[in-house]
Amino acid sequence: GQWNEQGLLICNEIHPARAKILSENVERMGIANAMVTNETPQRLAEVFEEYFTRILVDAPCSGEGMFRKNEAACEEWSTENVKICAERQDGILDCAASMLAPGGRIVYSTCTFAPAENEGSMTRFLLRHPEFHIVEVKKAEGMSAGVPEWAYFEEEKGQVLLEIAQTIRLWPQHLNGEGHYLAVLKKEGTLRQGYCRNGEEKGIAAKDLKVQGKGIVEFLDFAKDTLDPQTLAGSS
């Protein structure tokens, strides 16, 4: 989005090679106030408690939506891998929840059809985190509603949450693209500028909003004392 260089964008990629590619793309696109980290979600959650106002979780998944253009995705698929991915998504989402400020939003997305990784992941998350709810998104042409009844494997039973119908499925036969799923989650509370979970709340002065790059300088000072420099993307 257009944030007039007043925000701070932190992009995390757990695989070092992809993190370096991501760094190059951020630089090539001229994105201001942005940096790339190469950390586990658990490590980030330790130092960014209720820090972010927006979080995008582009979750690792079984890749069923890529079957048409990626033969490797077909060859690597298995029911067991779907379950492994679903468990990994649970952990990532829990970390995202702890890093989100009150009133903030999480956008969750996958490129798979697997219900366990889509409606299932959202249902499990909402049952673990009652402070969150699904935000209904206006559907564009070709978008379909999530299916609450698909939240569980055939052998499983559990609570069906009707608000899962407010999530979105993208089927390749209905639009020009591959298969995807997305949901928007909102955390209870009121989003406030200057919110600080572990300290005194400090408002943001108007003069500070006009200072280009102020946020990134403050973050880099913080990162030097907190994050492992060997895992910052681009480090030697």
Region spans (language model):
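Conserved S-adenosyl-L-methionine
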Residues: 2-8
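Helix-to-beta-strand junctions that scaffold the AdoMet/dcAdoMet cofactor pocket
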Residues: 4, 100-102
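Residue-level signal for inorganic ion chemistry
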Residues: 9, 22, 55, 104, ...
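S-adenosyl-L-methionine
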Residues: 10-50
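Mobile active-site "lid"/loop adjacent to the S-adenosyl-L-methionine
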Residues: 17, 53-94, 111-118
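Conserved Class I S-adenosyl-L-methionine
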Residues: 80-83, 119-143, 149, 153
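Conserved beta-strand signature within the Rossmann-like core of class I S-adenosyl-L-methionine
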Residues: 105-110
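Polybasic, low-complexity RNA-engagement segments
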Residues: 176-181, 186-236
